[in-house]
A protein has these predicted regions:
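Subset of outer-membrane beta-barrel
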Residues: 3-293
Length: 293
């Protein structure tokens, strides 16, 4: 009975908001709330953009989701010094072109359609002290299905980020996807609101190597709590190997990935790839490109 109180599958909508947008994050099992930085942090921990080392950060990520569905994330963050940091993000989930079929024309009517879900967000964060950041995003959600079916919604996300100051330890907390409901036909569905907590720190560190550990808890409003753990090994700040695991998720299990970071004309460029296992559903791969300047 106690466990059953958490089980509310199908009670929320706009599920694409739950999909990991970063190959680096996905490779670490999604345990990225206290690690995220730059434009990627607009999704995981908006407060972290206040600690950007560069003035601009731009990211382009692509996820090959199930059933030939594409999930993309593009974002830019700008550090405006003492005025805080600002960001814009766009998340898109879209299907391939599909045929319109009816009981009388099961092979198709000659019409085609796409189904798409979109999130456009604006973020802001500011340093409160040299170790504490606060931030958030305001988001516009748009869902488009066949013909005249369109729905709009709005959400906000708020987060806090704390640099412990010992062995690179960081703690973060976030409330995500808090906002208006969406109506499908005659049913009203809530947003997939979640509460997330993350803690990360250096396990090992030397002049040219480090091993970073991360653990997170994600409590969605439509399911039980999910535990996330991840590791990242860095070599010469150029090559990165990552692994992670989901605890309590209905399908997600292990994940792994790698990344490289290099300097081109005094501009840093990062490229990442990841693979995530979803049991009988298969493997999901992600790729990403990050520009820091």
């Amino acid at each position: 009975v106690v466990y059953g109180q958490y089980e509310r599958p199908g009670s929320t909508s706009v599920q694409f908001l739950k999909i990991d947008i970063s190959p680096a994050a996905a490779a670490m099992g999604g345990s990225y709330y206290s690690i995220a930085s730059g434009a990627t942090a607009l999704y995981y921990n908006p407060a972290a953009i206040a600690s950007m080392e560069k003035r601009f950060d731009v990211v382009f990520n692509k996820t090959s989701w199930f059933a030939d569905i594409d999930h993309d994330y593009s974002a830019i963050a700008y550090n405006y010094g003492r005025y805080g940091s600002f960001g814009l993000l766009l998340t898109r989930l879209i299907t391939d072109e599909m045929k319109v079929r009816t009981p009388m024309q099961p092979d198709g009517t000659g019409e085609t359609f796409f189904a798409g879900s979109y999130r456009l967000g604006f973020g802001y964060a500011k340093k409160m002290t040299d170790r504490v950041n606060f931030g958030g995003t305001i988001n516009y959600i748009f869902i488009s299905l066949f013909r005249d079916f369109k729905q709009e919604a709005a959400t906000i996300e708020l987060s806090a980020d704390y640099d412990v100051g010992v062995r690179g330890m960081r703690f973060s907390m976030k409330i995500g996807n808090f906002g208006s409901s969406v109506k499908f036909v005659n049913e009203i569905y809530e947003m997939p609101t979640n509460f997330s907590f993350g803690l990360s720190g250096l396990i090992l560190e030397s002049e040219n190597n480090y091993l970073l550990g991360s653990s997170s808890i994600n409590k969605p409003n439509d399911g039980p709590p999910i535990g996330l753990i991840g590791l990242e090994y860095g070599l010469n700040k150029m090559i990165f190997l990552r692994g992670g695991y989901n605890l309590g998720h209905s399908t997600a299990t292990w994940s792994a990935g790698a990344g490289v970071k290099f300097n081109v004309s005094n501009q840093l460029i990062s490229a990442d790839i990841s693979f995530s296992d979803y049991s009988s559903l298969g493997i999901v791969n992600r790729i990403g490109l990050n520009l820091h300047f």
